[in-house]
């Protein structure tokens, strides 16, 4: 099953389902046959394409003497490979072990030699990469694992611990060198010297030959960037031919490489590096493999060195190649590449902790590049993808101090340090970029090889794929240069913030970075980095660094503080002061209206200034908006500003339009032309003087226009008549006093002196105004109404002139307190009533009675209609009903209605449309307020729009909207179409009574003549018969008729111009008072 999955993963790139199935089927059959054949063999490591002529020997396996006929000879069980993955076509060697070795033992090496001129047709088909991991154990590889304990299996080799770090140096353009691989014999190792394993994977793809000295030659190392990723197996790149090498040359090259490792190479290139780069690979203890590679030579740059040593599996890998500007450790892709291509892959990522169980073949799925999909973020995957990037960064060992790193990656494999240096020389770049400058970052020195670090060139596209290297030893620490584009960085020991330094202090930040680059420190040490030290001392908030508190106050107020920055102007401080004084200043002034005043200290602030006597003489002044406040405060207050030195926030002087009140005293008071009622205040300094306020009296002999200042009447009900221009409450339910409107009182020529009655006479003068809804007449008729006054105050008459003339007061007999004087639009002259009739009390509005009006109720709900009818019966007024809007318009055309209760939601025609129709007919026929400006000639009116002039249409009808909605929009809509008021259902009877009384009084004032004629008709004998009609519709009640007869004998007699022009003039005529029933 595992083979099937591997084959399926390998052939994912095949296009088409048919070809994919055929390819899978054939591959599966081949793999199954090969697996069954391998299970019968003793060694299941590698199946050579052609068996070498020289059979396995005790100490050496030789080929055909350099003939190159076979690629690998059949190996004994002792030297067999761990296993082979049939899902891949490459062959690999793995040398894992859990044992440690002593470097002082003798070398017992065995050589595998071969000729560089390998036969292309006899090479192995592909490559197999064996990784360490958690793959399950294969059946064919089980036997080899059992031989590890007794020493018969593959044994790991040690590094040459006496070698020094190796430096890279330029080499000739094309070089063929041979590096030797030396490993000691399997003697008793030191358990404490190493602590982890290093699996080394050798990918062999060329045909190798073993010479008689046991030297393996013919391994060609090519850059991964130059190896084509062949989608088709037929694409086979041509190999570069290798010249044959003699045994003596191989032995000399091996000795030179060993001596290069032993000689100190610190700061100077080694002998071996003059011809090329070499790395040593550790194989089993009885074998030494010499790898040859030929690559074009390019100028190289020497890199620092890192001491890396393996524990149970140690290897010194010497790769013969020309040094490149960058070094990349790449892995051979899992695809089938050229038969002549070879690659060296080292897996350093998914390494488990040391244990005795050997590694197994990797069966994880791979992507198109041959990398495992589940280890995409590993160091090997990232190095494989970044093959054109920087090489391994290495450092010199520093002070022998062991510090355990606080942060370690689970994927990191540990290696113990030794004096041996491992230098990787990677493939060439097609277009090698220029080496970029790196910014060193202090990294934790660890005892393990955490990640692979890359220095030198840097590509932004590979920013997230770089890794950093941290190596450690028990007694040695090494510094690692980490690339600035490292994907994984060590977190800082302090909490990271968005900004630690103010943007204006970029120079400080640049200085800290330069210091950090000059002398990098290690995170985890006591000192830490410069940036960390400075960041700990700096404030975490920008406001704490650049702000300042300033004292401000209002004139005579308490000081307070506002927070400003060091570069704020005075104009900015005005905004802050306006927010500080939101209620006192923010509601009446804008920010530019404020003025900031500064008061300098009275004495020098410092002792030096007092001694020298050179204190600057500052004076109080207003600050300009463009001045920097903090600089001014430093100049005025060198020792700092205190609350006593608070800046004063001033506002411009407000010009008061009120005229000064006259001086007190018993003299005449006058007012200027154009002075409003608001300026004429009583001595109580308010628009409404309390009732108990004592007002000084004025002699009655003063001439000119004077103001009534007699004592307030004791009766509170006449308070509204006392104030000249205060309108009465809008309804009985709203009796709260309101501020009078700006009504101007026109002044004319001076009026003559008023005459006074005899001392101790009856009442004082009262000025009357029409009720709300009426038009202010040109002349105001003043009458005397007796009111209780103080005996010490003589009675006086007050006249407000509007035109030249004199109005003489006429004394009258005391009338009932409930009787109010009548107001008519034409000028009238008061005459004394006949003495033969007695004054009787009449029914007025103050007695709680509703004027006699006719109400039209428009309601489609029968329940609401019956309730409104019951209300009208209790109010003793006439009414009529309608069930829809069209019927309401028809009944209104008959005339005689003073009030309409109109429901909004009505069938056929809703209340709003009915209201519009009524208002249109009133406008066309010139009724009410439209009588002065008719819309057009009367003959242009249609017959349907003409109203009967004989009917009573003297005033516009009052329409009140009734609805169950309390929304403001519905109310506005009703008032917009012509309704006078708005009521919400359900209607309270008490509230409705007050409203009907208010509307009746308004209608009596609007249509006084029509209402008087109706009174005359109702007063005729037999009009009502002393009984009410059925339902109260169309006729006045008996009580209303009796009230009308009593009103005919009213005490107030008015001679009207209209009545005087009648054919039978009457000296007196009884006129009912507005609002009287």
Curated annotation (Swiss-Prot):
Where is the Response regulatory domain positioned along the sequence?
854-1000
Q: Does the keyword Metal-binding apply?
A: no
Q: Which domain of life is it from?
A: Eukaryota
Q: Which UniProt keywords apply?
A: Cytoplasm, Phosphoprotein, Two-component regulatory system, Virulence
- Residues bearing 4-aspartylphosphate are 903
Q: Where in the cell is it found?
A: Cytoplasm
Predominantly, its location class is cytoplasm
Q: Which residues form the signal peptide?
A: none
Q: Which GO annotations describe the biological process of this protein?
A: phosphorelay signal transduction system
| Homology family | Belongs to the SSK1 family.
Task: Say what the protein does.
Answer: Two-domain response regulator protein in the two-component signal transduction system of the HOG1 pathway. Involved in multi-stress responses and is essential for conidiation, secondary metabolism, autophagy and endocyrosis. In addition, regulates mycelial growth, cell nucleus development, septum formation, and organelle development. Also regulates trap formation and thus plays a crucial role in pathogenicity.
Q: What is this protein called?
A: Response regulator SSK1
What is the scientific name of the source organism?
Arthrobotrys oligospora (strain ATCC 24927 / CBS 115.81 / DSM 1491)
